[in-house]
Every structure is written in structure tokens, then in C-alpha cells.
């Protein structure tokens, strides 16, 4: 087995440059690699959580602030046992037509429940996590929201996290 270079271990070479090209003003200046972690046991025995930037939340909870010029630096816990009918989307920064027809397109809660029931993946954490992806202050996002979500993921006992941008 050959040793992987530092560059091949990152999320994707040139990721931050690509984001800055596509979203001028995003202010991302990261130069370090984003490491990928290997699972220590089979996925079928791993406790999984889901983290999404889709702006999904339990119906009736305080909506995300989708009009603030720098974004909303909060997140919602979404019980992993939720039914799609118990959830709603609060997002205006991307087209939601497909998501309104089938929320699983961007927040695959039913598919994850099925995969867990079929023992393809281990059990699900009590909560999944969602925030709005429109964040124009990446440093603040990393210092506050990302740290808070990471702490919540750990507190929920996750052994692996599936991250899904909207």
C-alpha cells in the first residue's frame, strides 16, 4: 500500500480557490489541508449523524434569519426520528422547488432511517443538524457555528458524520 501525499488526503485540492472564484467576496483564505478520517469499524456498526446546510428545521420552530446580509450563525437540531411532514425548509439562497416536492433530495432523513433499519449503517444519533449555508463571514462561521455544531455532534455520541451542502 502506498503512502498518500498530504495533498491527496485533503477534501479536494484547490477547494477554497474554487469557492472564492465562484462566490466573490466569500473571503475564504484557508491554505491548510482538510484531513479525511478513516472509520475505525465497519459503517454498519458506526453511529452516524447528518449535518446539512439546507436550512431544514422542525415545523413550528423559530425560522432561520435568511435575510441578514452576513447569514445566520445558528443551527437547529432535527430529531433523527422525524417524519418529513414534521420538517420545513427556510432558505431563499437556492432554488427549493425539488426540496419542496421531496425533502429527501437535500435532507435524506428517510433514506438514512431506512439504511439504519437495514443495518447498512449503524444506529443514528438522536439528532441531525441543519443550518443555512449562506455565510459571508467564513472566519466567524468557523469560530462559532462550526465549533458549536461539532460540540453538539460529539455530545450526541456520533462516531461519523455525513456532511451535505445544499
Where are each of the predicted segments found?
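Metallocofactor- and cofactor-centric catalytic cores in central/energy metabolism, strongly enriched
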Residues: 1-166
Amino acid at each position: 500500500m502506498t503512502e498518500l501525499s498530504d495533498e491527496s488526503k485533503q477534501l479536494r485540492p484547490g477547494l477554497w480557490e474554487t469557492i472564492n472564484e465562484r462566490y466573490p467576496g466569500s473571503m475564504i483564505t484557508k491554505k491548510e489541508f482538510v484531513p479525511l478520517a478513516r472509520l475505525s469499524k465497519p459503517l454498519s456498526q458506526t453511529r452516524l449523524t447528518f449535518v446539512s446546510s439546507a436550512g431544514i428545521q422542525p415545523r413550528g420552530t423559530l425560522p432561520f434569519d435568511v435575510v441578514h446580509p452576513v447569514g445566520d450563525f445558528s443551527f437547529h437540531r432535527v430529531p433523527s426520528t422525524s417524519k418529513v411532514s414534521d420538517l420545513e425548509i427556510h432558505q431563499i439562497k437556492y432554488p427549493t422547488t425539488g426540496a419542496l416536492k421531496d425533502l429527501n433530495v437535500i435532507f435524506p432523513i428517510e433514506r438514512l432511517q431506512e439504511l439504519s433499519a437495514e443495518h447498512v449503517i449503524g444506529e443514528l444519533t438522536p439528532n441531525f443538524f441543519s443550518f443555512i449555508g449562506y455565510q459571508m463571514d467564513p472566519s466567524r462561521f468557523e469560530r462559532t457555528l462550526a465549533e458549536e455544531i461539532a460540540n453538539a455532534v460529539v455530545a450526541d455520541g456520533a462516531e461519523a458524520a455525513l456532511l451535505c451542502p445544499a
